[in-house]
Structures are given as C-alpha cells and as structure tokens.
Design a protein with these regions (language model features):
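Hydrophobic alpha-helical membrane-insertion segments
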Residues: 18-41, 108-132
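Transmembrane alpha-helical segments in integral membrane proteins
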Residues: 12-23, 75-98, 167-192
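Terminal transmembrane helical module of multi-pass membrane proteins
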Residues: 143-201
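Membrane-interfacial entry segments at the cytosolic side of transmembrane helices
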Residues: 95-109
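Short, Lys/Arg-rich, polar N-terminal cytosolic tail immediately upstream
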Residues: 1-10
Length: 201
C-alpha cells in the first residue's frame, strides 16, 4: 500500500542531509567558481601576466588546489566511492520521504549528476578561464597553463584526462540505482500483504 503523506519531523533533517551529500562532491568546482568571481571583482583577468591575489593567497594557487581535489573526487568515485556515496544518499531519501515513487524519482535525480558530473566538473569549472596561455588538453602540451598570472598546468591537464573515468564510474552509479529500485519494490511488495492482513484482522 502506498503511503500518501511525506515524512515530517526528522524527515527535514534527512532532506538537508541529502542536499549536503549531493553538494559535497562538487565543492572543488564551487570553490573555483567563487575564486574566479572574487578575482574578477578585484579587476583581475584570467589571461593576466601579473599574479592575482585574494587576500594573502594567489588565485592561481587556490584554483590549482581545487582542481587537484576535484580530480581526487573523480578518481575515488570511479573506483567505488560513488556506490558508497549513493548508498548514503538513498538512506537519506528513504528516511526523508515516504512515497515510493518520490523515493525512486529522487534517487534518479541524485544518481544522474553523481554518475557524470564528478568526472567533467573540473574541466567545466575552468573552461571559462581558458586563454591564450592556458589550453588544457589530454596530452599536456604545452605543460604550462597560466590562469590569473600563475601556472596551474598539471592539474588543468589532468582535469581533461579524468573525464575518461566516466566510463568506469557511470556504470557503478547505474547499478547502484537499479539495486536501490529493486530493493525498494521488493520491500514494498512484502509490506503490502502484511498491511492487508492487519486490516482484515
């Protein structure tokens, strides 16, 4: 039997947990966008030769660190972390929502971005910053990539190469979603007869 009301009370905490779980893997990309926004507010251009600083820190150093973090997330997700992460998301969905189809649709909406974006997020985050001195590519040629007056070469080129990991990570996420849906439907079928027996009794 389908429940008509969504979770309340503690459900709000689980919904917030789901939002956090979806956003956390993309913190490196969010950081790059924020650094770029701050740099441009300060009058800096991505193609500038002079170093651009946000307070005591160079914008290029912040971007380089965020790119490395994004690549680490992508590597982790492509080798099984995505399944663990999605399991946590599914737990939050089950605890935060009661309707079966709400759970399935939310699981799909969560699984799709986590199946693809971790591998392309680093590359997409620096694509607006590409300039005459920075052309990220798989071959890493030329080895340098200057953004806001600093070299982010190796991490920028790795951001392009890491996209291939989607062919490992995406199937893992798809299998995790299918397992969740099957488990949800099986659990629903087991619950319905029990509820029917209680009503008739």
């Amino acid at each position: 039997m389908e429940t008509n009301s969504e979770g309340s009370g503690g459900g709000g905490r689980w919904r917030f947990a789901l939002l956090a779980l979806v956003l956390i893997p993309f913190l490196p990309e969010i950081a790059i966008w924020l650094v770029s926004f701050g740099a441009q507010l300060g009058g800096c251009e991505p193609s500038a030769n002079a170093p651009c600083h946000l307070g005591p820190l160079a914008a290029s150093a912040l971007i380089r660190g965020a790119l490395r973090a994004g690549s680490m997330v992508a590597i982790g997700f492509s080798f099984g972390l995505s399944a663990v992460w999605l399991a946590l998301c599914y737990l939050a969905i089950v605890r935060g929502w009661r309707r079966r189809w709400s759970r399935i649709l939310l699981a799909l909406a969560t699984s799709l971005p986590l199946a693809v974006l971790p591998y392309f997020g680093p590359m997409l985050s620096i694509s607006p910053l590409v300039n005459a001195e920075c052309h990220p590519n798989e071959g890493g040629i030329p080895p340098w990539c200057r953004i806001y007056g600093g070299d982010v070469g190796d991490p920028a080129h790795e951001a392009v190469r890491i996209g291939w990991n989607v062919f490992i990570g995406a199937p893992v996420a798809l299998v995790a979603f299918l397992v969740f849906v099957v488990a949800l439907l099986v659990a629903g079928r087991r619950t319905s007869p029990q509820q029917g027996e209680r009503v008739s009794g």
